[in-house]
């Protein structure tokens, strides 16, 4: 494992995952890999173990997901992995740690309220493994009340990442959307792409937001 991107959703994790892959750190395990690889039940098990009692997951347990087929992912980003900053930093001590954050906390909150939160509420597939996984992290991360608890979760999570990195004496890059290639490449010790290579701008939620706008 080379890189752990432990920021919350809607902090530029998808763009950063694509940037890392362009830099040769590939593959990156992102939220979209969960359904594609039928990992929802395993992540649900991990959440239940963390919040409902059990032995914390370590490298062996995470490798059931991230090392499937004997080929470990080179990095990870976004939920559900980011729910486990302390456990992942402990499990993969060799990995660089990046915390993606938004310049404006309120804009992050608003972005969540226009994407992930209504998507869960409007999901018609409530018997699916992916829905049950989402229900678990909505329950345990913000007590099923993001408008009330979301901002506190954002602050608590970011501090937990900082503290976990500090306990392992690991360098931490706090990366904000718009910072571009230079600080990322410097942190990872990699050459910066040519000036004509744009930093990725990716957003899996654009279609969802467009459909909501059309219905309004």
Describe each model-derived feature in a short phrase.
Residues 45-88:
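Conserved nucleotide-sensing/catalytic segment adjacent to the nucleotide-binding pocket
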Residues 1-60, 133-142, 192-216:
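PAPS-dependent sulfotransferase catalytic core
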Residues 88-114, 184:
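Conserved phosphate-donor/acceptor-positioning beta-strand/loop module used by diverse small-molecule
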Residues 13, 81-86, 105, 180-184:
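Short, well-ordered alpha-helical microsegments
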